[in-house]
Amino acid sequence: MFVDDGSRDGTWSFNSSEKRTSIRGLHFSRNFGKEGAVFAGLKAADGDCVAVIDCDLQHPPELLKRCIAWKNGAEVVEAVKASRGKEGIIYKLFAKTFYRMMKNSSAIDLDGASDYKLMDRKVVNALNEMPERLTFFRALSSWVGFRTERVEFDVAPRNAGKTKWSFRKLFRYAISSITSFYKRACR
């Protein structure tokens, strides 16, 4: 399942020109955001397992071979960042603070976590059944509580283009995520 979140770089025309019957795609008319794209892909995917991977190649596709732990009983194989790549000091500090606040407010430890995961069908079904409107895939995929194995990777430089995540967008996303998972709100 390929999800094109309203890109304007020709990605969709390149993908749709290939005659591969094993690959299906969703093409959004505009950018609805990472979370919307991930959850739309999860709803449309129908395999025994589903991998979530960014297309900017900062998530190395060859790591999927190491996600074989899924066949050995892991229900989620999560790729965790051994190194964060070439992030600026401000971004690293912001990420570290955000993860600490998430852990303190929700007991979900996201240190080193990424959205790069391979999940069993029952995990995908559980995520698809959740009523959340403000989604945070990285946390929800941990919160649902399935058996998880971890594999490490080093974040590669972006293959092309620039991130659309400004500091302001990241800050708003962080506040929304923390308040959505605040443990007192769940009581």
Model-derived segments and their meaning:
Residues 1-6, 26-27:
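Short beta-strand/loop segment that forms part of the nucleotide-sugar
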Residues 163-164, 175-187:
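Membrane interfacial helix-start motif at the N-side
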Residues 4-13, 57-58:
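A conserved acidic beta->alpha catalytic loop
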Residues 22-24, 147-149:
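Conserved beta-strand segments of alpha/beta enzyme cores
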Residues 30, 55-57, 153:
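Short, conserved catalytic or interaction motifs in soluble domains
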Residues 24, 28-30, 34-44, 49, ...:
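Acceptor/aglycone-binding surface of glycosyltransferases and processive sugar-polymer synthases
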Residues 16-20:
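Short, conserved SAM-binding/catalytic segment
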